[in-house]
UniProtKB/Swiss-Prot annotation:
Source organism of the structure: Bacillus cereus (strain AH187)
Domain of life assignment: Bacteria
Name this protein carries in UniProt: tRNA dimethylallyltransferase
Encoding gene, per UniProt annotation: miaA
Role noted for this protein: Catalyzes the transfer of a dimethylallyl group onto the adenine at position 37 in tRNAs that read codons beginning with uridine, leading to the formation of N6-(dimethylallyl)adenosine (i(6)A).
Top EC class, one word: transferase
Subunit composition and interactions: Monomer.
BP-aspect Gene Ontology terms: tRNA modification
Length: 317
C-alpha cells in the first residue's frame, strides 16, 4: 500500500558545469514538471554569478523553487532544506505536476530522498562555541583534523572550509558517542519517493575545460563586482561566503593573493569539487548515469524517465 502512495520525483545530479540546468528545463517542459534546486548555495539572494544560478531567461517559464530564499548573512541547514523541499514536492504533486530536483549538493538531496531524521537533541552549545573558537584561533584545518580522528568518513565527505558542518559532526560525536556518518548510514536504506535518479557525467578533461571556461565567463559577467558587493556590506564568516567562487575572491579583497592567483585557485577548487561530487554520487546513490561527452542526451533521458514513470503507474494499478 505504501508503495502505491509514494510520490513520483525525478532527480538530476552531476558535477558542476556538466549541463544539468538546460536538461532540467527541457525535461520539465516535456514531463509537465516544476524544478526544485538541490544546490545549497543558490538559496542565497544576490549571489547569482558565482553560484551559476539559473536566470529568468533560462527558466523559460518553468517554475523554480529553493532559489533566492535567504539573505547572505543568514545560515541554512540540511534539516531546513529537507523540510522545505518535501513541502514543495507535496505541493507540486498536488497540482498534478512532476517535481524535478536538480543539483550537485549530495547530502542535501540525499536528506530529502531518504528517511533522514534531524533533531536538536544532539546539541551542546558550550562545546560548539569551543570548537568555533578553536577554528578561529587555530584554523579550520585543525578542527577538521579533530573530525578525521573520530569520524573519518564524515571528514572525507565534509570539506574543511564547511566549518559549520565539521563542527556539527564533532558535536554529534561529542554528545551521542555516535558518528554522524553512522547515523546517516542507518537512514539510507529506504527511499521515501518513487525516484527516477539520473546522473550526468562526461570525459574528465572535457569537464575540467568546461569548468575553467565557466570561471572565465563568470569573471566577464561580473563575479568580481558581485563578491565586492558582499565584501563591502561587511559580510564575513558567514556560511554563504564559504562557497567556491566567493572565498577565493575574498582572499583577493583581503590582500592575501593577487586577482590572478584568486582566479587560478577558483578554477582548481571548482575542479576538485566536481571530482568530490562524482565520488559522492557514485558511492552514496543508485544512479543511472548518462555520459554527455559527445553531446546532450535529452531524448534518451526523457525516454528513460517516461518508461520508468509508466512502469510505476502500471505497478500501482
Amino acid at each position: 500500500m505504501g508503495e502505491v502512495q509514494r510520490e513520483k520525483v525525478a532527480v538530476i545530479i552531476g558535477p558542476t558545469a556538466v549541463g544539468k540546468t538546460k536538461l532540467s528545463i527541457d525535461l520539465a517542459k516535456a514531463l509537465n514538471g516544476e524544478i526544485i534546486s538541490g544546490d545549497s548555495m543558490q538559496i542565497y539572494r544576490t549571489m547569482d554569478i558565482g553560484t551559476a544560478k539559473v536566470t529568468k531567461e533560462e527558466m523559460d517559464g518553468i517554475p523554480h523553487y529553493m532559489v533566492d530564499i535567504k539573505n547572505p548573512e543568514e545560515s541554512f541547514s540540511v534539516a531546513e532544506f529537507q523540510e522545505r523541499v518535501r513541502k514543495h514536492i507535496r505541493e507540486i504533486t498536488e497540482r498534478g505536476k512532476l517535481p524535478i530536483i536538480v543539483g550537485g549538493t549530495g547530502l542535501y538531496i540525499q536528506s530529502v530522498l531518504f528517511d533522514y531524521q534531524f533533531t536538536d537533541d544532539a546539541g551542546d552549545a558550550i562545546y560548539r562555541e569551543q570548537m568555533e573558537k578553536l577554528a578561529l584561533e587555530r584554523g579550520v584545518e585543525y578542527v577538521h583534523k579533530k573530525l578525521q580522528e573520530v569520524d573519518p568518513e564524515s571528514a572525507e565527505r565534509i570539506h574543511a572550509n564547511n566549518v559549520r558542518r565539521v563542527i556539527r559532526a564533532l558535536e554529534i560525536f561529542h554528545t551521542t558517542g555516535e558518528k554522524m556518518s553512522d547515523q546517516l548510514e542507518k537512514q539510507e536504506n529506504e527511499l521515501l519517493y518513487d525516484v527516477s535518479l539520473i546522473g550526468l557525467t562526461m570525459d574528465r578533461e572535457m569537464l575540467y575545460d568546461r569548468i575553467n571556461l565557466r570561471v572565465d565567463i563568470m569573471m566577464d559577467q561580473g563575479l568580481l563586482e558581485e563578491v565586492e558587493g558582499l565584501y563591502n556590506r561587511g559580510i564575513r564568516d558567514c556560511q554563504s561566503i564559504q562557497a567556491i567562487g566567493y572565498k577565493e575572491i575574498y582572499d583577493y579583497f583581503e590582500d592575501r593573493v593577487s586577482l590572478e592567483e584568486a582566479v587560478s585557485q577558483l578554477k582548481t577548487n571548482s575542479r576538485r569539487y566536481a571530482k568530490r561530487q562524482l565520488t559522492w554520487f557514485r558511492n552514496k546513490m543508485d544512479v543511472t548515469w548518462f555520459d554527455v561527452t559527445d553531446g546532450e542526451k535529452t531524448s534518451e533521458i526523457l525516454r528513460y524517465i517516461e518508461g520508468k514513470l509508466q512502469r510505476k503507474s502500471n505497478n500501482s494499478k
